[in-house]
Amino acid sequence: MTKLPFGETLTDWGYAGGWLMVRAMPGVLARNVFDAGAWYAARDGGPEQLRKNLARVIGTTPAEVPDSLIRASVASYARYWREAFRLPTMNQAELARRLGRVFIGAEKFAIAREGGRGAVMALPHSGNWDMAGVWLAQNYGTFTTVAERLEPESLYDRFIAYRESLGFEVLPLTGGERPPMDVLAERLRANRFVCLMADRDLTRSGVPVDFFGELTRLPAGPAKLAIETGAPLHPAHVYYDGDDCVVQIDDALDTSSGDVGVITQALADRFAVNIAAHPQDWHMLQPQWLADLSEERRARLEGTGDR
């Protein structure tokens, strides 16, 4: 067996240790530990890229983003990880019942199932999307999603096992036995549900959209699947309200144009409304807009740079 580079081994061990340690902690202690970590991460203005991203959301400059919003955002991100580490040990049925009490638009799943074509749920990285998945798995059985491969491979395998333990079917974005789009379309035709993270695709295959007044790219997958299979495409959103994790399923987008660009822009517009309503829960710490990429990367993206 090929040995992992030492740094990658430490990364995997770190996550494995975190999972074991946080699961074993009393709930109050885990909350205090992650709150302290969030406070530390938000000191001195917090992560620079997070500040740039939130500036677009609230319509200001990075320097004018309130420190209180940065602190709330980092705390929300820390909460996601605290819950993620502890989620497999929670009572899944009870968790689904708690989520169901504050779920907005849950009836759309039943309507979609009656329609016979399943449904595509497209989400941004907001709140705790894994908890939303637990509710769906508990109420409607296994659904299908896609995950990018991580390095090291052992860490990727750990994340896959984690989500499969919650009732998710997880397809690799690359390197699988079949193209993921083929499998997703097959699941929809079998009247099953597909859930996709869809707020960032800074590659040549991404669809150009206007997002908070600036150019970026979003994945084409949700729109393509809806066009190909006739499944409804629902924007979804997850956010925190006090101790509650709220899942919101919006009305299906109009996909009758058959135009991937038009549909993806409509998805971006709905994401923008929902993110603006709960900016602190949008966990986007990477460059989101083309303007934040290096000139070299933008040139490669447009196909004008060296390959």
Tell where the protein language model's regions lie, with residue ranges:
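Membrane-anchoring hydrophobic helices of lipid-metabolizing enzymes
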Residues: 1-123, 156, 160, 167
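Non-catalytic C-terminal accessory region of glycerolipid acyltransferases
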Residues: 2-6, 67, 71, 113, ...
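Short, flexible loop segments at the rims of nucleotide/cofactor-binding pockets, characterized by
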Residues: 95-101, 169-175, 212-213, 260
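Conserved beta-strand termini and adjacent loop/short-helix elements that scaffold enzyme active sites
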Residues: 104, 146-148, 173, 250-252, ...
